[in-house]
């Protein structure tokens, strides 16, 4: 334990908190190009084929991003917009692709929470 005199001379160091979305470099979103689109399985106790994409961002970082919603039109070389937000049952997936922007289409036949999935309002 330091003495009062040592604290007067040096002071206490503030702890630096780790940034959860480092690849975005402080931006709310980043544009990127899909390098690989594939499915992966979640951790126990869940079971599914989760759709994910490997994306090279404009910050020159390659990340794994989750594709939310049912069905998608993404393939290699698609331009996507990526936001932060992890997927709890997929280790290493800390980003999500924003539906309805750039090359990503919105989810078809979506009635509720449409703005999250880039779905247009139905006519009538």
From Swiss-Prot:
InterPro entries: NA-bd_OB-fold, Ribosomal_uS12, Ribosomal_uS12_bac. One of its GO terms (biological process) is translation. Keywords: Antibiotic resistance, Ribonucleoprotein, Ribosomal protein, RNA-binding, rRNA-binding, tRNA-binding. Residues 108-118 have a biased composition (Basic residues). GO terms for cellular component: ribosome; small ribosomal subunit. SUPFAM superfamilies: Nucleic acid-binding proteins (SSF50249). Part of the 30S ribosomal subunit. Contacts proteins S8 and S17. May interact with IF1 in the 30S initiation complex. This is Small ribosomal subunit protein uS12. The gene is rpsL.
């Amino acid at each position: 334990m330091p003495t009062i005199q040592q604290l007067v001379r040096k002071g206490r160091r503030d702890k630096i908190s780790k940034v959860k979305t480092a690849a975005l470099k402080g931006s709310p979103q980043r544009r990127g190009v899909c390098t690989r689109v594939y499915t992966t399985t979640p951790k126990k106790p869940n079971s599914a084929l989760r759709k994910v994409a490997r994306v090279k961002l404009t910050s020159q970082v390659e990340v794994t991003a989750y594709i939310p919603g049912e069905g998608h039109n993404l393939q290699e070389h698609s331009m996507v917009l990526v936001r932060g937000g992890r997927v709890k049952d997929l280790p290493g997936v800390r980003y999500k692709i924003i539906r309805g922007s750039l090359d990503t289409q919105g989810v078809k036949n979506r009635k509720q929470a449409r703005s999250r999935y880039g779905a247009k309002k139905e006519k009538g």
